[in-house]
Swiss-Prot record:
Transcription factor that specifically binds AT-rich DNA sequences related to the nuclear matrix attachment regions (MARs). A motif (Bipartite nuclear localization signal) lies at residues 102-110. This is AT-hook motif nuclear-localized protein 8. Disulfide bonds: none annotated. GO terms for molecular function: minor groove of adenine-thymine-rich DNA binding. GO terms for cellular component: nucleus. The lineage of its organism: Eukaryota, Viridiplantae, Streptophyta, Embryophyta, Tracheophyta. It is found in: Nucleus. Residues 136-147 have a biased composition (Gly residues). It comes from Arabidopsis thaliana. The keyword rRNA-binding does not apply.
Amino acid sequence: MDSRDIPPSHNQLQPPPGMLMSHYRNPNAAASPLMVPTSTSQPIQHPRLPFGNQQQSQTFHQQQQQQMDQKTLESLGFGDGSPSSQPMRFGIDDQNQQLQVKKKRGRPRKYTPDGSIALGLAPTSPLLSAASNSYGEGGVGDSGGNGNSVDPPVKRNRGRPPGSSKKQLDALGGTSGVGFTPHVIEVNTGEDIASKVMAFSDQGSRTICILSASGAVSRVMLRQASHSSGIVTYEGRFEIITLSGSVLNYEVNGSTNRSGNLSVALAGPDGGIVGGSVVGNLVAATQVQVIVGSFVAEAKKPKQSSVNIARGQNPEPASAPANMLNFGSVSQGPSSESSEENESGSPAMHRDNNNGIYGAQQQQQQQPLHPHQMQMYQHLWSNHGQ
């Protein structure tokens, strides 16, 4: 017996039950098919990628992607992957095409390169024009009149229509003026401001409107209804806060007359404020500058009632135009209880072309102003009447 042939030992490890093993003769021999686990799944195939041209690799990837898409569609039941079922791919191809279209950024051009306007008006639809024509023809048969088509709405211009401001003045009962010109009147120390304004109005037939003034006064006579005498005289240094008024021209029986009024608000040395209508002197304590404006008022002719015309009565004389705003009550003359102011004989704001300046005693005979003249600045002081 050869020593090389060693009999198998009884102590050799036996395979566990349930496992088949081949005979231990050749360890390098191929494994028995009994050792290979059985499986119903197909083996995973790993295709080799060519290392050649890059274009070939891209083509291979595209073919593989198409195969995967076809299998996915078949598994979902959307088709067999044929070209007829390609549009049902959830819009993937449409999205890819939209991404390929380049979108222009920014606002579109208003003018084309040739210089013409790119944004033109859309032409009128022929259906709309035909409908409008048929509507006009139908209106002819129904109404029997002229069946013209409805004109397009006219574009309305922006701003106030011409002539509307004059209508507003007519509604307020006033008239407009023309040729407004500003002026500055210099009043020296010790001069009467009211007399200066009246002297300035004598230079022409224009209406005077007092706008403002700056300076101080030393003596002023004001009309105040709360006082027992009705007229109060203040002496001292008073700063002018506001000075306003007007000088009006009006005709009575063919003669031109002037009538004016003046209102002032003054600040005393102790901080108190006094004011009212000026009925006498307004003496300047320092040099005073008065800013006035002159213009030509367009007076309206009074309307004659049909009753007066039928009876042959003369119409009422025209009074001062009502468009001027009176910035204070018109002085009707000093009160009979104050004798000191009557004896002073200070000039008032009434003047006639024939008689000149009326004194304080003659003011009661002067014709009063138009009753429609307005009162302003009455709320600035509680003691002011009218």
